[in-house]
């Protein structure tokens, strides 16, 4: 019987995410919040919800709930775009900066603990294999 690699990878992602969520709980944030805030920081200022959804790799309706939560927490603001009233621009608030630093510290320390005992060469090898798997999957997906 062949190795259930897909199941193993899915389980790894699930437990990694659960640990991140557990460690972000004192900040009343989740990994989904962190990924969203991280991408807002990486994109040029005041990106649209559509651009943010594309950067994260999710559909815009899936993003709206997370943005609602971040807005309720006072970490972002959204305003209507002057050129396209259907589009909303996203901006981090001043109070988001210290929270983002704290979240990044939690994420970085957790990642370091998870990777403890694994060499840089092993990490690079794993990253290369994951990239090959992703490439193969995308090629198969695009063929069908």
Swiss-Prot record:
- The name this protein goes by in its record: Transcriptional regulator SlyA
Which InterPro entries does the protein's record reference?
HTH_MarR-typ, Tscrpt_reg_MarR-type_CS, Tscrpt_reg_SlyA, WH-like_DNA-bd_sf, WH_DNA-bd_sf
Q: Which residues form the HTH marR-type domain?
A: 2-135
Coding gene?
slyA
Homology family: Belongs to the SlyA family.
User: Which HAMAP family does UniProt cross-reference here?
Assistant: HTH_type_SlyA
Q: Which residue ranges carry the DNA-binding annotation?
A: 49-72
Its assembly, as annotated, is: Homodimer.
Q: Does the keyword Transcription apply?
A: yes
Q: What does this protein do?
A: Transcription regulator that can specifically activate or repress expression of target genes.
Q: Which SUPFAM superfamilies match?
A: Winged helix' DNA-binding domain (SSF46785)
GO MF, one term, reads: DNA-binding transcription factor activity
